[in-house]
Amino acid sequence: GSEMCIRDSHIPEPDNLFDDFSYRGTAIREQTLTLYKNLSHSILVGDPGELGELSPDQRKAWDAYRSKFSKPYQAMNLNWSDQSRELSRFKYQSLLKNFLASGAGIDKNVGRIRAFLQENDLADNTVVIYMADHGFFLGEHGFFDKRFMYEEALRTAFIVHWPGKVEEGVVNDRDIVSNIDIASTFLEMAGIEIPQEIQGRSMVPVLEGKTPDDWRKTFLYTYHELANHNVCLLYTSDAADETC
């Protein structure tokens, strides 16, 4: 199927796959997003702890599936800790093929949802939105993951099908919207009053091609310190590892 076509393909590399940070600022020189150094085996093939939850038959099927894609790496005869360009290229191909295979699976299942709406006469009365909470580096600058403030991590997918409201095929790459706008947008779509204290603004006029003159032109992004999500870290005289 589509996944095997992806697996058998060679994905073109971005021009800046081997970006040089040696002459740049501290933040980019000390980031932990590089393919050659930070993309581990477990990220590509799954954490061993997670695989331990599989039944023997499931594990056998998983190992057989993965072996088809590990053979090229084994043929390279490189250590996973090696920082050569050959291993970086292998990691890039593996990352992109995993990503594209996942995207193909999403596309297939979005199609199933759309088909259900059509078959049950719901398509004209349903808003379908595909979105993500962040962008992702796919080899650009030699990176994977997110967080670093480059275009690839800041831009996110936000695709809207709203019959009678949003013109098909129109792309808006000018106006700045944010995930804080989503709640207000959904409320207006549903005809519900938007509370004054809510953050963000409804994107409905933007989606309709009627962006207000006072729509935001700038925004601030920060990501710093100890990035332990949902954990409050307290500094002490000895360390910063106590939680509250």
Segments predicted by a language model, with ranges:
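Single conserved hydrophobic/aromatic residue that forms the stacking wall/gate
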Residues: G1-D8, Y235-C244
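Active-site-proximal cap/lid insertion segments
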Residues: S2-V177, M189-E197
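Hydrophobic side chains within alpha-helical segments
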Residues: V110-R112, S184, C244
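C-terminal cap/loop subdomain of S1 sulfatases and analogous C-terminal strand-loop tails that border
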Residues: H134-E140, I180-A183, E188-S237
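Proline-centered helix-kink/hinge sites
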Residues: A157, P163, A183-S184, A239-A240
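Residues that cap or initiate secondary-structure elements
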Residues: G164-V166, L226, T243
